[in-house]
Design a protein with these regions (language model features):
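Extracellular/periplasmic solute-recognition and catalytic clefts
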Residues: 1-49, 60, 72, 183-187
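Append "and occasionally in soluble cytosolic enzymes with long acidic Gly/Pro-rich linkers
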Residues: 33, 52-153
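Loop/turn elements at helix/coil->beta-strand transitions in domains of secreted/extracellular proteins
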Residues: 6-8, 27-30, 53-58, 66-68, ...
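Ligand/substrate-recognition segments at binding pockets and active sites
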Residues: 1, 117-190
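A generic secondary-structure signal for well-formed alpha-helical elements
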Residues: 9-14, 64-69, 74, 78, ...
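Solvent-exposed loop/turn segments at secondary-structure junctions
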Residues: 9, 15-18, 38-40, 49-51, ...
């Protein structure tokens, strides 16, 4: 619609992907303005699920998530990696925290020490239970699907089977509100919204 002249402007999250933004940045026909970040993209872990109730599993996933690669490879650097939920510019949020470093070897070691041993099919197991985690994403979001597929591949290297499920937006939101997920994408807008 923008390219056909049917609309004058695109604004907001999930309205346009990083590929299109980069295309428009190089175009003489369009002007692109990017604001400072006002939200934080996140993946919420449901700690009431059997597997994710284990702190060591959650920490291992943190170490197995290469936020810089997601920033560079999916967002072309347009979205920077976040190490905290709120920006340091939010009152009382400018605190010293040591972020989890990307380290697949450490992630595997943490899982080994927590009793999650590599089983058949390169999926870890503990007490006969495979390390299967479901990630729910909004099927309308190309970005969320790309991140989900990247994480699925990355987690596979440490023996975690990440099953990704795209759902239309209303179903996605209903399942998120009901807690029917292991992992789910969300956005934190900061004050005054959160």
């Amino acid at each position: 619609a923008l390219e056909k002249g049917e609309i004058d402007m695109i604004f907001g999250k999930n309205m346009i992907d990083a590929d299109a933004i980069n295309q428009y940045l190089d175009s003489d026909k369009f002007t692109v303005e990017l604001s400072d970040p006002t939200s934080t993209r996140q993946i919420v872990l449901n700690t009431s699920s059997d597997i994710l109730s284990e702190k060591d599993v959650r920490i291992a996933l943190q170490h197995a998530t290469n936020k810089q690669n997601i920033s560079d490879g999916i967002f072309y650097g347009l979205e920077k990696p976040a190490d905290t939920l709120f920006a340091s510019t939010v009152p009382y949020c400018d605190i010293e925290l040591e972020p989890y470093v990307y380290d697949l070897e450490l992630a595997g070691q943490i899982l080994d020490e927590a009793g999650w041993k590599m089983g058949s099919g390169n999926v870890r197991e503990k007490d006969g239970q495979p390390l299967n985690i479901d990630l729910l994403y909004n099927s309308d979001s190309v970005t969320e699907k790309s991140i989900a597929e990247y994480l699925q591949s990355e987690y596979q290297t440490i023996g975690v089977a990440l099953n990704i499920h795209g759902e239309e937006e209303q179903s996605y939101r209903d399942n998120m509100k009901a807690g029917n997920f292991d992992m789910v994408f969300n956005i934190c807008w900061g004050t005054p919204y959160d």
